[in-house]
Regions:
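Catalytic cores of secreted/periplasmic lytic hydrolases that degrade extracellular macromolecules
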Residues: 2, 11, 15-186
Length: 186
């Protein structure tokens, strides 16, 4: 009886720790990068909620190998014209026989560089230009627009971003004051 109870308690603790880990990691990620997301929102018009949701999703709360070893928090691949640092990682590219290939991803000196480059990537790419006519307060249209424009292959990508925005109340960062407002006063 005691042994069964001990096994049950151990199992319950393991389940709680697994369920707690993403919440804890998500909250730490948000706390660490929320200001950067707001700065990028005012620099580019991309909602901070979308930036944080993508960062959480694409980097697995900042814990993915790509985020930890290449500072790439958005899963941006190299493309043929990329001249910066690179990092090779198996993702979603297959050869003709169905074998998973290593994909070339952009590597960054810092997470700040990853955030800035991702914003620039969206602003400079023709396929994302239409997103910039959407209000920074309309995170749902941004999420669906990113998916429809081909940002991700996951058919549930937009819903996953929206789910994170609602779950972690990321929409509140879209209402943040411009961090440079005080510099613009006479």
């Amino acid at each position: 009886m005691f042994k069964s109870l001990l096994v049950f308690i151990t199992f319950a603790l393991v389940l709680v720790s697994f369920n707690h880990a993403p919440e804890s990691a998500a909250n730490e990620y948000i706390e660490q990068y929320k200001d950067l997301a707001v700065v990028e929102m005012y620099r580019t018009g991309i909602p901070a909620s979308i930036t944080l949701a993508q960062g959480l999703h694409e980097s697995n709360y900042g814990l993915s190998k790509l985020a930890l070893e290449a500072n790439n928090h958005f899963g941006i691949k190299c493309k043929s014209w990329w001249t910066g640092k690179t990092y090779f990682h198996k993702d979603d590219d297959f050869d003709a026989n169905g074998n998973l290939l290593e994909s070339c991803f952009r590597a960054y000196r810092s997470t700040v560089d990853s955030y800035v480059d991702r914003s620039n990537f969206l602003m400079q790419s023709e396929r994302y230009k239409h997103l910039f006519s959407i209000s920074k307060d309309d995170y749902a249209s941004w999420a669906y627009g990113l998916k429809e424009s081909g940002y991700a292959t996951d058919p549930q990508y937009a819903q996953k971003l929206i789910e994170k925005i609602i779950r972690y109340e990321l929409y509140k960062y879209d209402q943040s004051e411009d961090p440079f407002r005080h510099l613009l006063k006479d």
